[in-house]
C-alpha cells in the first residue's frame, strides 16, 4: 500500500476494504476508496483537554486466570486507537499502524446517533414534524415501505419493511444496498441493481406488518433520515452537521 501501485496482494479494493488486514489502512483512508464529504470542525468550539498522561505499559489484564500485558491486548485485538479520559482529563492515548492523532477514522453506525441528534435539533427548531409521513417530505418514496411510515417510525427503527440486515452478505437486498451506497461493487449475478442510494430507498419493499408493530434494525432508515434532513433544511447533510 506504500508503493505505487502496491503489489496485488497488498492492494485495498471495494472487495476487501472491510476485511483484515486491509482494515488497518482502509479505515483511515475511506476517502480514497468511496465518495465522501468532509465535515468542517468549528475551531471556536474546540476543546483542549487537560492532560495527565499515565504510563499503562505495566498494566495487566486478567482473562481466565491468565495475566496479559495491556499493550499486548490492544495489539492482539488489532486496535487502531484507544483513549482513556477520567473526569475530563486525558490520561492515556494509543495509536497503531496507520492511525495518527488527526486521522479521520471511519465510525460506522455511530453516524446513526449523530443523524438522530441532528433530526432532534431540527425538531426543536420546528423545522421537522415527526408525525408527518415520509412521503409527505420525500414523494419519491410513494409505493414503498416508507410511504405511510411516520418520521418517528424511521427514528424508532420500526418501519415495516422487508429489508434484511445481513452482515454475512448473503441476502440479496443487503447486497444491493451495499452496492447502492458505493461500499461494494455491484453483484453482476443479481438483476435490477440500483442506481445509487436514493434509487434504493425509493424502492424499499413493504412487509405485511404494521409500522410500529415490531422493532426492526435497518441501516437504510438512517440513510433516509439524512435525505429527509436535506429536504426539510435545503442544506447538504454534511454542512448541517
Model-derived features: positions:
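Active-site helix/loop module of the DD-peptidase/beta-lactamase fold
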Residues: 106, 124-167, 206, 233-241
Amino acid at each position: 500500500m506504500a508503493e505505487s501501485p502496491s503489489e496485488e496482494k497488498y492492494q485495498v479494493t471495494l472487495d476487501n476494504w472491510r476485511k483484515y488486514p486491509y482494515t488497518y489502512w482502509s479505515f483511515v483512508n475511506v476517502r480514497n476508496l468511496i465518495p465522501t464529504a468532509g465535515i468542517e470542525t468549528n475551531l471556536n468550539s474546540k476543546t483542549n483537554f487537560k492532560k495527565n498522561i499515565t504510563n499503562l505499559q505495566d498494566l495487566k489484564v486478567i482473562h481466565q486466570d491468565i495475566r496479559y500485558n495491556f499493550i499486548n491486548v490492544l495489539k492482539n485485538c488489532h486496535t487502531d486507537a484507544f483513549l482513556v479520559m477520567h473526569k475530563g482529563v486525558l490520561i492515556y492515548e494509543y495509536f497503531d499502524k496507520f492511525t495518527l492523532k488527526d486521522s479521520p477514522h471511519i465510525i460506522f453506525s455511530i453516524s446513526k446517533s449523530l443523524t438522530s441528534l441532528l433530526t432532534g435539533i431540527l425538531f426543536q427548531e420546528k423545522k421537522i414534524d415527526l408525525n408527518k409521513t415520509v412521503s409527505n417530505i420525500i414523494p419519491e418514496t410513494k409505493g414503498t415501505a416508507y410511504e405511510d411510515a411516520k418520521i418517528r417510525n424511521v427514528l424508532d427503527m420500526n418501519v415495516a419493511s422487508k429489508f434484511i440486515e445481513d452482515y454475512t452478505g448473503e441476502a440479496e437486498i443487503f447486497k444491493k444496498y451495499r452496492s447502492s451506497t458505493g461500499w461494494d461493487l455491484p453483484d453482476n449475478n443479481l438483476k435490477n441493481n440500483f442506481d445509487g442510494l436514493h434509487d434504493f430507498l425509493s424502492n424499499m419493499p413493504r412487509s405485511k406488518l404494521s409500522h410500529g408493530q415490531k422493532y426492526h434494525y435497518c441501516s437504510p432508515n438512517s440513510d433516509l433520515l439524512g435525505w429527509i434532513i436535506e429536504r426539510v433544511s435545503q442544506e447538504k447533510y454534511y454542512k448541517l452537521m
